[in-house]
Structures are given as structure tokens and as C-alpha cells.
Amino acid sequence: VLIVCEGSKTEPNYFRELVDHLRLNTANIEIDGDSDPSPKSVVAHAKRRYQQEEGFDRVFCVFDKDEHSTYQQAVRDLAAEEVTDVFTAITSVPCFEYWLLLHFIFTTKPYARSEAYSPGQHVMRDLKLHLPAYSKGSQHVYYQLMPQTDLAIRHSERAGQQAAQNQTDNPTTQVHRLVTYLRALKNS
């Protein structure tokens, strides 16, 4: 399993902590935060690694929409690849921190740019109401939130259903799909 993350710290830290907690064999799961921080770069990096290295039966590309101009192209590129059942897009709109916020509250409030803040910065402000010490790249976030992971999964699934009904993706996250997949690996 290869997990390629847009972020070099926050997302890789979270998934490394999850893999560690589940006691999954790290020889079989590689978490890569070395791509450039754009959705298109994440997808290109993941495809390159998959083509150059053998042994990856699943490849997850973890990236945010926030205000990235290459988001839609990356989603389309992966949709074309998903027919192989190898590549999966794990998107968050507007950002990964929305997944973290769902550990505390259910919200489908759309996040938009204001004069002072990007959509992602608005999510960060909401998250800090519940997790005041959080900052990008924080360590041990998974362990802090672990007791609420099942709640976050339910919130994420519900938000996705509501977003589909409302024909929007703001806000949504697919991180629950990767968390559920990794949990299933532990039980297989």
C-alpha cells in the first residue's frame, strides 16, 4: 500500500500514527509526503512511484481542494485510473483539517474565502475551538483524536450524503475511506 500525501507533515504524521496504532506492518505500507504540494503533483508522484516500484497493490492519493487550481484535473486523472482498482483519491474539501474537525462536531457549513481568510484557514479557526494547540505539522494528532474516530467516520459519511443531495462537495472528506481500509487490513 502506498499513501501519497499533499502535506509533508500533517497528513503523513496522522497516517503514520494510525498505522503504528493498528500495528500494521510498515514494510507493507509506505506513507510518502515528498511530492510538491498540489493535487496534480500528488497524482503524478503517485503514478511515477507505482510505475517505477513493484509491490503496491493499492495507491491512495491524499489531497485538499482548498484553493488549488489543479484539484479538478487531479480528480479527473485519478478517476480514469480508478477502473484498475489500484488508485483512489482521498480528497478533503476544503482541507484535511475538516476531517479532524469532524471528530468533535458535525457540520456541513460551506467554507469560502473571505477578505482575511482562505477556506482552509476558516476550518483551522473552527478546529482550534476544539483543539486549541493544533497547528499544521502537529505530532500525535491521531492519538489525541483516536477515541472519536468512529464518530468522525459517521460524521464524514453523513456530510458526504448531504453534499451529494445538495450537489456540492463543500465541505466533504474521503479520509474515512482510507481509515476504514487500514482498519480492515488489521482485521484481515
Which ranges hold each PLM region?
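Short, extreme N-terminal leader segments that mark the start of a protein/domain
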Residues: 1-7
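C-terminal accessory helical subdomains adjacent to catalytic cores in phosphodiester-
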Residues: 2, 12, 16-33, 51-58, ...
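Short phosphate-binding loop-to-helix
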Residues: 35-45
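Short amphipathic alpha-helix with an adjacent loop that forms part of the alpha/beta core around
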Residues: 45-51
